Swiss-Prot record:
Organism: Euglena gracilis
Principal place of residence: mitochondrion
Feature: transit peptide: 1-37
Assembly description: Homodimer.
SMART domains: EKR (SM00890)
Inducing factors: Expressed in both aerobic and anaerobic conditions.
Name of the protein in question: Pyruvate dehydrogenase [NADP(+)], mitochondrial
Cofactor binding description: Binds 1 FAD per subunit.
GO MF annotation list: 4 iron, 4 sulfur cluster binding; FMN binding; iron ion binding; oxidoreductase activity; pyruvate dehydrogenase (NADP+) activity
Alphabetized SUPFAM superfamilies for the sequence: 4Fe-4S ferredoxins, Ferredoxin reductase-like, C-terminal NADP-linked domain, Flavoproteins, Pyruvate-ferredoxin oxidoreductase, PFOR, domain III, Riboflavin synthase domain-like, Thiamin diphosphate-binding fold (THDP-binding), TK C-terminal domain-like
Cited CDD domains: CyPoR_like (cd06207), TPP_PFOR_PNO (cd03377), TPP_PYR_PFOR_IOR-alpha_like (cd07034)
Known cofactor(s): FAD; FMN; thiamine diphosphate; iron-sulfur cluster
Amino acid sequence: MKQSVRPIISNVLRKEVALYSTIIGQDKGKEPTGRTYTSGPKPASHIEVPHHVTVPATDRTPNPDAQFFQSVDGSQATSHVAYALSDTAFIYPITPSSVMGELADVWMAQGRKNAFGQVVDVREMQSEAGAAGALHGALAAGAIATTFTASQGLLLMIPNMYKIAGELMPSVIHVAARELAGHALSIFGGHADVMAVRQTGWAMLCSHTVQQSHDMALISHVATLKSSIPFVHFFDGFRTSHEVNKIKMLPYAELKKLVPPGTMEQHWARSLNPMHPTIRGTNQSADIYFQNMESANQYYTDLAEVVQETMDEVAPYIGRHYKIFEYVGAPDAEEVTVLMGSGATTVNEAVDLLVKRGKKVGAVLVHLYRPWSTKAFEKVLPKTVKRIAALDRCKEVTALGEPLYLDVSATLNLFPERQNVKVIGGRYGLGSKDFIPEHALAIYANLASENPIQRFTVGITDDVTGTSVPFVNERVDTLPEGTRQCVFWGIGSDGTVGANRSAVRIIGDNSDLMVQAYFQFDAFKSGGVTSSHLRFGPKPITAQYLVTNADYIACHFQEYVKRFDMLDAIREGGTFVLNSRWTTEDMEKEIPADFRRNVAQKKVRFYNVDARKICDSFGLGKRINMLMQACFFKLSGVLPLAEAQRLLNESIVHEYGKKGGKVVEMNQAVVNAVFAGDLPQEVQVPAAWANAVDTSTRTPTGIEFVDKIMRPLMDFKGDQLPVSVMTPGGTFPVGTTQYAKRAIAAFIPQWIPANCTQCNYCSYVCPHATIRPFVLTDQEVQLAPESFVTRKAKGDYQGMNFRIQVAPEDCTGCQVCVETCPDDALEMTDAFTATPVQRTNWEFAIKVPNRGTMTDRYSLKGSQFQQPLLEFSGACEGCGETPYVKLLTQLFGERTVIANATGCSSIWGGTAGLAPYTTNAKGQGPAWGNSLFEDNAEFGFGIAVANAQKRSRVRDCILQAVEKKVADEGLTTLLAQWLQDWNTGDKTLKYQDQIIAGLAQQRSKDPLLEQIYGMKDMLPNISQWIIGGDGWANDIGFGGLDHVLASGQNLNVLVLDTEMYSNTGGQASKSTHMASVAKFALGGKRTNKKNLTEMAMSYGNVYVATVSHGNMAQCVKAFVEAESYDGPSLIVGYAPCIEHGLRAGMARMVQESEAAIATGYWPLYRFDPRLATEGKNPFQLDSKRIKGNLQEYLDRQNRYVNLKKNNPKGADLLKSQMADNITARFNRYRRMLEGPNTKAAAPSGNHVTILYGSETGNSEGLAKELATDFERREYSVAVQALDDIDVADLENMGFVVIAVSTCGQGQFPRNSQLFWRELQRDKPEGWLKNLKYTVFGLGDSTYYFYCHTAKQIDARLAALGAQRVVPIGFGDDGDEDMFHTGFNNWIPSVWNELKTKTPEEALFTPSIAVQLTPNATPQDFHFAKSTPVLSITGAERITPADHTRNFVTIRWKTDLSYQVGDSLGVFPENTRSVVEEFLQYYGLNPKDVITIENKGSRELPHCMAVGDLFTKVLDILGKPNNRFYKTLSYFAVDKAEKERLLKIAEMGPEYSNILSEMYHYADIFHMFPSARPTLQYLIEMIPNIKPRYYSISSAPIHTPGEVHSLVLIDTWITLSGKHRTGLTCTMLEHLQAGQVVDGCIHPTAMEFPDHEKPVVMCAMGSGLAPFVAFLRERSTLRKQGKKTGNMALYFGNRYEKTEFLMKEELKGHINDGLLTLRCAFSRDDPKKKVYVQDLIKMDEKMMYDYLVVQKGSMYCCGSRSFIKPVQESLKHCFMKAGGLTAEQAENEVIDMFTTGRYNIEAW
């Protein structure tokens, strides 16, 4: 080394140097025998100075022949060197640099040793900042350390970069240069990141190609050791990092030779070590800081010479000689460009072309950017240069110019002879914008022009500021002669990219050809567009731009030919291969005319293959990659066919061997079939194609953004968009993915209406919101396409029609919905044939108004009727993340703000131009923003604080406006209501529009109103959500998240836990479970999963929940609770990911989620601080026990299986430890559940376990009510779902009460199925002899399988020897008080049998507060379910006036939608005179206006007059239940009355007497005058008026706009002789024409079949109504010319003369041939009573024909008493007419029930 490179060390320090040398192992006083190198400063007593270390000479003879060819990408080329010359690496994933760290981790896991014979220690950190800190620490300890990063990751390293450079520590950071997030995030290439660290003191060395990535990495590692200056080695992200090229690489032995002797030892000697201690990183004051800073100058002064010297030293080893500045071009060039990175090779090609054309041009290609050597730069410039264009791949908005431009300009100013050279700057290639030779030619044209554009841009059209230079796309060919080019268009996850990577390596590693491959992707995570650009040739290929003149193009997805101009890039006579199902005739219709013209005019050889069909036959499904690859090798001739076939088969073993022999065999079979057969088949191109005329064009949407920006983006034409169409700042409209219509699914779900139970599970789990429930009116159904089949809607949508509809062109075909459906109501069908039909259906469905407001949006089922405001995202098929966020938008979307961390959710949720977040019909929807990866919690926190502050301001203004009454009375009332609800859920949404409308009209009245109107967007209670993945929450963003959760701020955090960094390719995070194999943990993760939720719970004031798709109801509940909590909340959702490698595929995502819960792998729990304030345990464990096999669960995921293949013993050990950890964690949660608030054992010593099986929550609610009753009777109680117990524990439970519902056709609820399965297994006789039990079933007695599950459990427990305490009880949904009626009749027997003492009652705490507010304005109140209906006729009696029974018909005018068979619910009002009489007796003034503050869920008016409240709302004339009497006894002052009330409450004889006398609430208050609850309690104790339901006798098709009722005005005489009439009957009996009442539609079991099927109808009395409706409907259809099936009606009533209802109409149907009628009038002949069931027996042949042979349907409507006899009669008919046995006849009846052909409506 030249002496000038380092100053000579002063003699004063020589002794210290010698002394220091002995410390590192040299012999003191011995003369050096080898070359002397300078490295690093030596510690002295007060200051570090440089010194020399002498080491023995070693064999460093270059051997360039040791190099080997290998086809690698830039990342692998770099990692090869970095791994060899490092001993530690600290890594963190960030695209596009992650691959470098992944490879280092792979090699470490494989035990590969570096050049020094040691396995590199590769450690993943929590962030790039952590990686830099660890790097600094390792260097301080003397390690040879490195890291890999990009973009924001590099910026996070800046503080430590200053430290490392300041302390003169040798190191290399390898950077895949990438853009920084500014107006938008871009993962693509640019120099913004590296330019942001140019001031840190690190040397910066740039690679331009894949080969240089290897070489410059080597030069960096050598030069840093020689100079003690750390290096940033960078190359262009993606374009170089991910380009595959065949390059020469040095083996480790050769790399080791290049390590300067003694430099590593010198570095070690400077380490922090107690054997030679120093102090580093001190605090310096003003007296010495400046000087110490300047003391390092000597290390930088000649650093450029050190680098050049290193390049010279490396050259003999690699055969490639580099310069820090390389000049190419004419020696007398006048125009020169200066640039670095991958664009350099493109400019080089352009220079060669221009020089051949006689142009005097050249280029300076920069390698060493920092330190910038002015001398070296000036030296390479030709003396003839007149103009220079400095090209930067970054933009610095506020600077005079970009960095390279400034450096060039400053350099030339230092040389007088160069000061006349004109320098301009330009930008190119930002965000990996393809930089092609034509762009380079345009730059030279601009440079040579008279007035060149300064600070120009190239590759874009800047029509705003005019910076862009024009270029002509002349398709110049600058490639080496003999280069062949290919493009493969694929669909994400079809294997195309992987196959092409394999193909390049096959060709590169098995031939003399050089190879290059580059891969392009769109924004979709999976199922997106991929294009693979491959080149092959005899000479090295450095063209770093996309293929534009291809010899071979393959399109692996047929729809692409309609979207992409892919043949624009094919040369004349090239080969085109299409995977399609089309015949030549189909192609005429399907392939656009311009595409066909290209085929013909360019004389393209066109081949077609139906790859999917062929691969299906081999069992490969959509994985068509190997078939298409075989076609390529067969047609391209790149390799000899036999060799290509052999190599392909070998590559299959390598690629798929780990997936099993079967997969290998299938892929090899399909490859061999291609080589052996006539695949693909050449298409004989019709001559007419050359002149094909466009017959159709894409229909514009009329939305400018979609037509002008989004569609070009999707069609890969974004490069053509000008600057003027962009919005400065990077904002984009929402709801654009609905226009994408990618149509990527080969199969889509088809709805099977007959099987559907309308649970909406399919909609919940759909990752892309492509399958949804729709509710329609009859009128809407009539307008629907013929294929738009519906069925009768249930629940809140009574009277309407239900359909599950898929969006066929948005569906990804993931099959999650099909696999999740519990009723087999979905099946996958061929998309090719189904899409045309379903497209029409979808287009119709989405135009139907959303009716989500008609149901409870905060329930599982109800949430799915809400419009998803996240739809058609770019997430992978089967994604486990999107359903959570979709649910969030359905629950709170129209008032939600989302701060989204960078990661998967920001890519599928925030890709420019393709926004899946959308709006409702009002234009409201989630506002979404992304800051960075590391700061998302703080970003969201800032939004929350700002919105809270703004809302507080608007609240202050509204408070003043209300106090000052500046608005009219109506608006003031609304604003006052807003003040009450302003921070409570979505209550304000109900009247928000009214407020805004009122403000718009009145804002000119007062400045306060003007201010409020100006802040109207703050009126909603904004729901703030912070969303991100587990890597963000547990690692890089944990510090911020922890602070935000600790802040107490009201906001919500949702962590989408895939247990790895999914977005960057599946690297381990701290959320990754032990034993899992992930990138950066290929040897299996050896530490426990971080428990983020427990950390959050430790604060005590954070709502915390874990959720999973395996328990959808719990998930919905947790979301609702979290959002309602006034404070920070944290929800962590288990999100299955494609990176998990589910053996059954992502279609089974929900089942695997269920298994995760069952095995304890993912426990479900909620921590609600509000419960602690109530004295309850805030911790709620929702998965009560471990009940699955953990090992089986793990064995279904490749991430756990792969470790066992590589390290069986290690895998078993880690999995065993994980199982122990999971068990220990679960036991800890059990202890938390039993925590300090758990009651001690009951004093009585009695204990009961209450178990429930619940689907909708009824059984669970009843179980918890029962638990309270047992606790009051001094029992200790445990309440659990049946599936949460271990069945083996039953024998030790002592006493068990089971409450269980029946679902569907006799099915167990989901949370009891495992219990029943286990209980059915073989057990020892008398196994449960020590168990006492009782069972209560919930069901609907009109169903054949009424309480079937309860009966099964009861019988099974008895068979196992358990002792039945009391007989099974039944709760009938059809009873007036639903299941409570049966429960209240059953439970006393339990208390009696147990001999429990009657507990002391405690008065409940009311959920309402009541105030007298005389100045308030009363509100008009209607129940949510009600709609005004107008009586057209009043009540028209149809039985004689003197007859005792009064049947009436009523015609109603209404817009309510209903179906034949539905009932009309009528909301009665109490008689005003009776109410006023009661109020006067009670001492209440009916005119008083009261305000009710309602904290519960009950529907009550906010402000109302007392008289109206008791008339319209409270059921004061209803029948009290036994609990009412208990409560009333608290208020009884008179002792005798109190005792009597308590006696009645025990449900003894007096209670029965009261029931028989039909006493109502008003009666009871008269009977007990000393019991006077306050108005507050009175309202609590008296329930709301319920609608009474009456069968509808009309059909919408017959009398549209009308509903007809057939009603029996029911009156009766009580035992005491009192005359009673029902409340509603009283109102209807006196109904007048034109009178309006509140009504609603209620669905019944009467769901009628296809009109061509026969039906049998049995009616008693007014039960005739639905059958009249059915007859009217079929009669109308027949008149329309439609075919209808046979109809038989069996009608029963008392007397023919007076009660033959609708006689004339029924006779008319008989005469029309529509109806067979049989009537049974039971009291006409007292001696011989005839009933309906008797008449059925007489028609045995007709019954057998209609119901068994023709599979018709049976309907019964009327009294419950005739239901069973009719069934028996049917069985009789089947046996007699069909010759069936009794068992066979029974099975036929059962089949009718289970297939929905037997319907009952009984009372």
